[in-house]
């Protein structure tokens, strides 16, 4: 499986999310977040992005570390009810 991770310099959460992804057998493509990358990402997903990391899995913008962690765990019991 592949994940694209948009990162910034000296970003602890970026390092953590890359470790989480690697531990779950993802291949990582890392992109440094700069003005052009930010503009491309916001245009592609029609969303305002203010933080890094930002992770894309299966052409879906998952979000930052906590969103990726929740994505790895799958739906919770309460989500299955609804």
Give the location of each predicted region.
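Non-catalytic, surface beta->alpha helical segment in thiol-disulfide oxidoreductase systems
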Residues: 57-82
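C-terminal alpha-helical interaction module
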Residues: 2, 7, 43, 75, ...
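Local sequence-structure signature of Cys/Sec-based thiol-disulfide redox active-site neighborhoods
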Residues: 1-27
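Short alpha-helical
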Residues: 12, 36, 63
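Structural micro-motif
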Residues: 45-55, 65-66
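Conserved beta-strand scaffold positions in the cores of enzyme catalytic domains, especially
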Residues: 28-30, 61
């Amino acid at each position: 499986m592949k994940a694209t991770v948009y990162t910034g310099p000296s970003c602890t959460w970026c390092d953590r999310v890359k470790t989480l992804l690697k531990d779950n057998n993802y291949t990582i493509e890392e992109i440094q977040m700069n003005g052009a990358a930010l503009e491309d990402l916001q245009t592609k997903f029609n969303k305002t992005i203010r933080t890094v990391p930002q992770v894309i899995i299966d052409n879906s913008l998952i979000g930052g570390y906590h969103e990726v962690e929740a994505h790895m765990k799958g739906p919770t019991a309460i989500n299955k009810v609804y």
